[in-house]
A protein has these predicted regions:
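Single conserved hydrophobic/aromatic residue that forms the stacking wall/gate
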Residues: 1-9, 13
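Short alpha-helical scaffolding segments that buttress acidic/His motifs in well-ordered protein cores
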Residues: 26, 43-44, 80-83
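A conserved active-site cap/scaffold subdomain adjacent to cofactor or substrate pockets
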Residues: 16-33
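Membrane-embedded transmembrane-helix bundle of lipid-linked glycan/lipid transferases
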Residues: 45-48, 59
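Non-catalytic C-terminal accessory modules of carbohydrate-active enzymes
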Residues: 32-36, 50-54, 63-194
Length: 194
């Protein structure tokens, strides 16, 4: 009896973890779950109850799902910063699970730069709060006419967490998603953090 109840709990946790793995149709999933508010509340519960598994690759895009819904982007920013601080350290066990050919390290680096490709095969990124003040990415001249992408962030105070505004190529971006072309051809991605 004990092993059955333990197995049922493990199945329940696994089912919750895989529920949100529909990266190609987040809006359709939200409709099936009762709409935006219900979707956001259920997703937040995964984080609040400690059910999010940072070592389980299908889960790693979950913090960005909030940003698909206007007004909920702050949750992405909060959760990615919390997860970086909790699970990615300079200790010997400073990466959750194993690195699976660099998957977890790449997750951390993308987040530290302020963007993440949350849907495989879709050339778009969700923006989140960068850790670094400045990052320069040198672009391959075989593929891009631009030489580099500069990412800069300025904080109104040292512990600022939330994005106040974003500019790409000097123009204000009024959303928290950016296409690959916008990113690599914009030259400069600027975050103002409040």
């Amino acid at each position: 009896l004990h092993s059955t109840s333990r197995r049922q709990r493990q199945m329940c946790i696994r089912d919750r973890n895989y529920t949100y793995y529909v990266p190609h149709d987040v809006y359709g999933l939200a409709r099936l779950m009762g709409g935006k508010k219900s979707f956001v509340n259920k997703l937040q519960m995964i984080f609040d109850e400690g059910l999010y598994d940072p070592a389980n690759e299908p889960d790693i895009a979950y913090p960005y799902l909030f940003s698909y819904f206007k007004g909920e982007e702050w949750r992405t920013q909060k959760e990615t910063q919390r997860l970086l601080a909790k699970y990615f350290t300079t200790q010997p066990d400073g990466i959750p699970g194993n690195d699976d050919t660099g998957t977890m390290s790449t997750w951390a680096i993308f987040n530290m730069m302020g963007f993440y490709p949350d849907c495989p095969g879709l050339p778009e990124y969700t923006l989140t709060t960068p850790v670094f003040d400045k990052v320069i990415i040198r672009l391959d001249p075989k593929w891009y006419k631009e030489k580099e992408l500069v990412i800069e962030s300025t904080r109104q105070k040292p512990d600022a967490l939330y994005i106040d505004n974003v500019k790409i190529g000097g123009k204000k971006l009024n959303r928290f998603r950016i296409t690959h072309d916008e990113l690599v051809h914009g030259g400069r991605l600027e975050f103002s953090i409040r």
